């Protein structure tokens, strides 16, 4: 709201009435407000029921423990945000703080999405090996920098992937620190938000969020053929849309309050009224997204649920791309990734590493000729 007031000209001499306490608000609500609160309670209850339904299937049908832990955080994204919005509708004075809590959790889920992507491959190092083996490079020409064609591509090394990961991980840390300082400044001003600090903190939070989104947009396209059976793209887009709705919607309502489309009344001042309606919109929007996830990520069509009896999602073999039954994460073979040095296989692709003895590797003429063919390329790489 502070950024909107700074940009939009308004009457600075006008002092908005104070936000009522929860007792005053509940005692003087209109019939429309009571009806909306009742409907919001129903939406939140449905969201919680859906989340417990999701939790049951994750606990029972996801074999990998690290993926289960990531899924827990994503499952509770919708109930936490809707519950915070509902409490803010009951307690208008706490709505701003609860909105900040939900936004911090949204930023935390961005980092969880990156961690989940790593765990699909088995870890960050395994993902790096997979990408290097297929010569898949990191492309930085993604939104919002999709028109900057001059941006270089870099190798998908473990160090580069870690740097992109930190682009995402910085935002929950920065937002948490900014909100803690904002609470201290607000208490010092007896609840008023008239300090220039709030404009600065919101600008910093916006910049941090944009950097985190950019890091996700760079990371998600990597290895898409590998994580496509998991419907990871849909899962990420759902989280992305939820955060955009939660952030942009509040700005739109605050803009309407700043230009006079939403005015103060005997119930709430304009700023609190705008946030109240934004919170109400959030309850049914998150419920719809939760229902959409229930259908599109159903266990029979999503490779995450590898223990589900009806899961028949085909898995691509790492060597020949043939279809097979989805194996459990705990039963993956050690030959899923081909051993390579500087992008060159350590053995001919026609023979399995499990069937070659050390003596075969020395005497096999196929192996000798294979390394002879690739000797020049290895020398060039080392020379660089």
UniProtKB/Swiss-Prot annotation:
In terms of InterPro entries, this protein maps to: Ostalpha/TMEM184C
- GO MF assignments: transmembrane transporter activity
Q: Which domain of life is it from?
A: Eukaryota
List of glycosylated residues:
11, 28
How does it sit in the bilayer? Multi-pass membrane protein
The name this protein carries in UniProt is: Organic solute transporter alpha-like protein 1
Q: Where in the cell is it found?
A: Cell membrane
Which loops or segments lie on the Extracellular side of the membrane, by the record?
1-38, 92-93, 187-202, 262-273
* Any one of the GO CC terms: membrane
**Residues in compartment: Cytoplasmic:** 60-70, 115-165, 224-240, 295-384
Q: Which residues cross the membrane?
A: 39-59, 71-91, 94-114, 166-186, 203-223, 241-261, 274-294
The task this protein performs is described as: Probable transporter.
Q: Give the record's keywords alphabetically.
A: Cell membrane, Glycoprotein, Membrane, Transmembrane, Transmembrane helix, Transport
Q: Which family does it belong to?
A: Belongs to the OST-alpha family.
């Amino acid at each position: 709201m502070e950024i909107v007031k700074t940009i939009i000209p308004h009457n600075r001499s006008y002092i908005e009435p104070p936000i009522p306490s929860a007792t005053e608000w509940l005692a003087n609500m209109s019939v429309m407000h009571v009806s909306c609160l009742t409907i919001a309670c129903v939406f939140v209850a449905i969201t919680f029921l859906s989340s417990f339904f999701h939790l049951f299937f994750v606990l029972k049908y996801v074999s990998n423990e690290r993926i289960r832990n990531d899924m827990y955080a994503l499952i509770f994204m919708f109930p936490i945000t809707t519950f915070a919005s509902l409490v803010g509708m009951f307690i208008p004075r706490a709505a701003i703080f609860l909105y900040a809590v939900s936004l911090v959790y949204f930023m935390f889920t961005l980092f969880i999405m990156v961690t989940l992507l790593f765990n699909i491959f088995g870890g960050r190092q395994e993902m790096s090996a997979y990408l290097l083996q297929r010569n898949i490079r990191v492309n930085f020409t993604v939104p919002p920098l999709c028109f900057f064609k001059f941006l270089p591509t870099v190798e998908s090394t473990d160090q580069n992937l870690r740097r992109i990961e930190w682009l995402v991980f910085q935002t929950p840390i920065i937002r948490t620190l900014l909100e803690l300082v904002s609470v201290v400044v607000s208490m010092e001003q007896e609840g008023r938000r008239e300090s220039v600090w709030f404009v600065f903190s919101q600008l910093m939070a916006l910049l941090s969020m944009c950097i985190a989104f950019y890091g996700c947009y760079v990371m998600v396209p990597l290895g898409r053929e590998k994580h496509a059976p998991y419907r990871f793209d849909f899962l990420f887009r759902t989280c992305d849309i939820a955060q955009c709705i939660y952030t942009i919607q509040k700005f739109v309502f605050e803009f309407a309050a700043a230009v006079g489309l939403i005015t103060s009344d005997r119930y709430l001042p304009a700023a609190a009224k705008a946030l109240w309606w934004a919170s109400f919109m959030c309850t049914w929007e998150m419920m719809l997204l939760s229902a959409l996830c229930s259908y599109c990520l159903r266990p029979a069509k999503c490779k995450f649920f590898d223990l589900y009896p009806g899961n028949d999602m085909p898995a691509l073999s790492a060597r020949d791309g043939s279809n097979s039954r989805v194996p459990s994460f705990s039963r993956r073979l050690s030959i899923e990734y081909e051993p390579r040095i500087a992008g060159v296989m350590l053995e001919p692709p026609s023979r399995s590493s499990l069937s070659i003895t050390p003596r075969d590797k020395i005497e096999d003429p196929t192996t000798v000729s294979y390394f002879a063919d690739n000797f020049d390329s290895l020398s060039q790489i080392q020379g660089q």
